[in-house]
Amino acid sequence: MKSSASAPAKAILFGEHAVVYSKPAIAAAIDRRVTVTVSESSSTHVTIPSLGIRHSSERPSGGILDYIGRCLELYHDASPLDIRVEMEIPAGSGLGSSAALTVALIGALDRYHGRDHGPGETAARAHRVEVDVQGAASPLDTAISTYGGLVYLDSQRRVRQFEADLGDLVIAHLDYSGETARMVAGVAERFRRFPDIMGRIMDTVESITNTAYRELLRNNTEPLGELMNLNQGLLDSMGVSTRELSMMVYEARNAGAAGSKITGAGGGGSIIAHCPGCVDDVVTALNRNWKAMRAEFSVKGLI
Ligand SMILES: Nc1ncnc2c1ncn2[C@@H]1O[C@H](COP(=O)(O)OP(=O)(O)O)[C@@H](O)[C@H]1O
Ligand SMILES: C[C@@](O)(CCOP(=O)(O)O)CC(=O)O
Ligand SMILES: [Mg+2]
């Protein structure tokens, strides 16, 4: 018996970290996927070639294996499995590798067990795994990997799928990441020390996200870049940017991008830039020191 499923990675356009405090956020699935295949086996093995992982244990753990171990505990029986994970994105890159892996594994386990409960339950189950492993997580990453396309997560945590022509977006990433759990904990500590200031910062991020959503619904991408720059300034004030992420952000702007910001938890990982009419220039400029790619959207969710 063998089953497989695939889920996309994502880029957060607006609202990362604020979304942990029930502020809205906008995310887009990108054409980089994680595919998981599970098959019956005499003992449990996990193979992730892109990470050089060949792991054998009844309860996989350590790094990204924590997400797999928790999924098996919650959504599988005790029978041994061979689990193979093909990842088209670097782990820890701010592009949602943990969420895409979790959603794809839950999809493969559901098919293996003959379950069919729809995307809402899949997203909820995957979100529970991220919370259990990370200590805190919004439903954003797991929702976008489940539903695909474009998602606006509102302040009541409702998933609103929508369509818009995002135009020319570029994603660039570093070779290292800031561990999401650690970055989320750092923002929580700053919130504890400066609750009023941080509360106002998150309120302002909410205004930026809602302005962007309103304009995208009108298919107006003109203010997108400037709104990204405003969001970046507030991410910097949350303490999640780094010298190198700031260098990438400014390299993209100097090459003509209308705006650019961190995408994901920060501390490392990736940036996103809106580059109307200058995608090639921005990719060329960023590729001098980092790894950049034109992001393709309108991507399917869990399949
Ligand atoms: N080379 C690696 N081997 C195993 N686990 C890794 C490796 N690189 C990153 N990880 C783990 O992968 C997970 C990535 O999840 P996260 O930090 O949420 O980043 P993202 O979701 O943005 O990709 C983390 O648990 C991290 O410890
Ligand atoms: C920082 C946060 O808003 C997004 C984290 O994204 P990623 O795990 O770095 O891809 C956390 C969350 O939404 O759970
Ligand atoms: Mg993650």
Curated annotation (Swiss-Prot):
SUPFAM superfamilies: GHMP Kinase, C-terminal domain, Ribosomal protein S5 domain 2-like
Active site, renumbered: D141 (proton acceptor)
Names of required cofactors: Mg(2+)
Pfam families reported for this sequence: GHMP_kinases_C (PF08544), GHMP_kinases_N (PF00288)
GO BP annotation list: isopentenyl diphosphate biosynthetic process, mevalonate pathway
Compartment(s) where it occurs, according to its Swiss-Prot or TrEMBL record: Cytoplasm
GO cellular component annotations of the record: cytosol
Entry keyword annotation includes DNA-binding: no
Xref: Gene3D superfamilies: 3.30.230.10, GHMP kinase, C-terminal domain (3.30.70.890)
EC nos: 2.7.1.36
Binding site for ATP: P90, A91, G92, S93, G94, L95, G96, S97, S98, A99, A100
Pathway: Isoprenoid biosynthesis; isopentenyl diphosphate biosynthesis via mevalonate pathway; isopentenyl diphosphate from (R)-mevalonate: step 1/3
Homology family: Belongs to the GHMP kinase family. Mevalonate kinase subfamily.
Listed PANTHER family: MEVALONATE KINASE
Biological function: Catalyzes the phosphorylation of (R)-mevalonate (MVA) to (R)-mevalonate 5-phosphate (MVAP). Functions in the mevalonate (MVA) pathway leading to isopentenyl diphosphate (IPP), a key precursor for the biosynthesis of isoprenoid compounds such as archaeal membrane lipids.
Protein name as it appears in the record: Mevalonate kinase
Organism: Methanothermobacter thermautotrophicus (strain ATCC 29096 / DSM 1053 / JCM 10044 / NBRC 100330 / Delta H) (Methanobacterium thermoautotrophicum)
Recorded name of the encoding gene: mvk
